[in-house]
Amino acid sequence: MSKYYLKAPYQPKGDQPKAITKLVDGVNSGREYQTLLGATGTGKTFTIANVIAKTGRPALVLAHNKTLAAQLCNELREFFPNNAVEYFISYYDYYQPEAYVPVSDTYIAKTSSINEEIDMLRHSATRSLFERDDVIVVASISCIYGLGIPSEYLKASVKFKVGNEINLRKSLRELVANQYFRNDFDIGRGKFRVKGDVLEIGPAYDDRLVRIELFGDEIEAIRYVDPITGEILDSLNCISIYPAKHFVTPKERLVTAIDDIQKELKEQLDFFNKEGKLLEAQRLEQRTKYDLEMLREVGYCNGVENYARHLSGREAGSPPECLIDYFPKDWLLVIDESHVTCSQLLAMYNGDQSRKKVLIEHGFRLPSAADNRPLKSQEFWNKANQTVFISATPGNWELEISSGAIIEQVIRPTGVLDPLVEVRPTKGQVEDLLDEIRERSRKKQRVLITTLTKRMAEDLTDYLSENDVRVRYLHSEIHSIERIEIIQDLRMGEYDVLVGVNLLREGLDLPEVSLVVILDADKEGFLRAERSLIQTIGRAARHIEGKALLYADNFTDSMKKAIEETERRRAIQESYNQQNNIVPMPAGKKANNSILSFLELSRRVQKDGIDNDLVEIAGNVVDEFKFNNNSELAIENLPQLIDELETKMKKSAKDLDFENAAKLRDKIHQLRKKLIR
């Protein structure tokens, strides 16, 4: 019996029941690959949620970017409130990989900034996979990178159970070995403290504290407590505290690894000396010996990931263990927007290896550093279990390997039809576009515009803004999480028009958008290929008045095929509605994203330069501080403001006003980031 409980205010409709039945039968019969060819807005996520619930298997849902992963995770958490729906993406806020540019003799050291909240979510995902069998992990493509050794990670966990006797000193040593740090004053994730007969731990996978109460050597109680107020949140009978880092190396393995690194170093030095590369030999010897000394003394060094093959005991060229290896044997892989995601699998490995090759050739790293890498495409498929591809426009490869198991889902439960598509000449297109935007704005509807170049998008945004259109420009330099926020603002009506280049196609769930505009639709190429056009047109497929405007002076084959496919689907939908007396109804999705809120990564640009939320929650505190000429908080005032806000936060917590205390905590976190910059 399935351990999943699917909660939804509606039942499968249209061709969802047929798609669910076929997919479930395919999974249960052991079919390796299936493709759900679902038009935009037909409820593909709900269909997959039903498949997961009926098959009862742990599932990995793979998305091609963080924005789409957050959206999927949010939807699945609403469908499965009582099950473990986890979020696993890259934990870097900023990442500059190690590199060397031979032409200019420039070495670039690795620099990065790890987001603690995302790191916690990653640990939560692996913990759930060890402890539960009702787990759905929504991940970005970063899940194919090495993630330690699951068996060692599990083996290293420290277990506590009520009624058991423990050696406290031994348990503390085990926590330290698992990279937890003792801090009796500032407790948090990855830290622990001891006060009398109470041990408190900040586990890597949770923002709550674990309090272990002792009576002599016996564990009397295990509780979850609030880290700010100390309020008891839950009582437990037993708990496993997993390592603070996924990469765990036992002492005996570390000794062997150091020996192996020394042997490889000797071989590579002999090679460089034989080739007359004395500078490379000297550079490699100096760097590696320093790293070896650090490994001996503290078990860690900067760039330790480059020795991952030796530390994990893998053979040369063997694939690293990643998130997939934390799953049990019988699991389900779901690849969303597969026509994009599958191609990423190949690109990730190739890009990584070209950079590593230069570092190795010039003596910055040992050859084994090349094995600190993402999975190759074939290695990924060797590890994958049964797979369901999802896309409105599947790639040829997915269609080929899913031959005989391609399930089409065209009918929308809402009865909404595919957009009407109209082609207009480019002459006078901007003025014509402005009229269309004003008409949609009067109806409180939203507009998406896609251009071919960044320059054109910028110029169009400026022009529309000058003509009193509330418009934003979405471009590639915007942080992934901020992108989610911009899309949320569009849905909430903060502005009416969103302009972009290649950011408005796959996966964006925008029921408020009634008009999609494609400029230069007749310029053949990747951005105006058949699949791209179908995907872009589909952004207006959730609105009753959905329409797509293609500005072009010629009629390309891609345009012809995209329009024909849209009209084919529209005819099927219209016929179904007539036969079943269905009147199209607008989609009523909430414009919220709990993942975005949880990550504490809001970077909203305030129109007046002052954080209005900060003013609202902190009362008059902000008014007492000076502002610079740009109406922003002067940097020299930040430390004092942070102190004041911390005082108010503690008072709010003491007064049991936890909501306000949490808001103040978030703002303090943001201000500290500004101070660091």
Curated annotation (Swiss-Prot):
Gene3D superfamilies: P-loop containing nucleotide triphosphate hydrolases, UVR domain. It comes from Prochlorococcus marinus (strain SARG / CCMP1375 / SS120). ATP binds at G38, A39, T40, G41, T42, G43, K44, T45. NCBIfam families: PRK05298.1, uvrb. Keywords: ATP-binding, Cytoplasm, DNA damage, DNA excision, DNA repair, Excision nuclease, Nucleotide-binding, SOS response. This is UvrABC system protein B. Belongs to the UvrB family. The lineage of its organism: Bacteria, Bacillati, Cyanobacteriota, Cyanophyceae, Synechococcales. HAMAP family: UvrB. Residues 25-412 form the Helicase ATP-binding domain. Its main location: cytoplasm. GO terms for molecular function: ATP binding; ATP hydrolysis activity; DNA binding; excinuclease ABC activity. It is found in: Cytoplasm. Residues 429-591 form the Helicase C-terminal domain. GO terms for biological process: nucleotide-excision repair; SOS response. The beta-hairpin motif is involved in DNA binding. Residues 639-674 form the UVR domain. Forms a heterotetramer with UvrA during the search for lesions. Interacts with UvrC in an incision complex. A motif (Beta-hairpin) lies at residues 91-114. It comes from the Bacteria. The UvrABC repair system catalyzes the recognition and processing of DNA lesions. A damage recognition complex composed of 2 UvrA and 2 UvrB subunits scans DNA for abnormalities. Upon binding of the UvrA(2)B(2) complex to a putative damaged site, the DNA wraps around one UvrB monomer. DNA wrap is dependent on ATP binding by UvrB and probably causes local melting of the DNA helix, facilitating insertion of UvrB beta-hairpin between the DNA strands. Then UvrB probes one DNA strand for the presence of a lesion. GO terms for cellular component: cytoplasm; excinuclease repair complex.
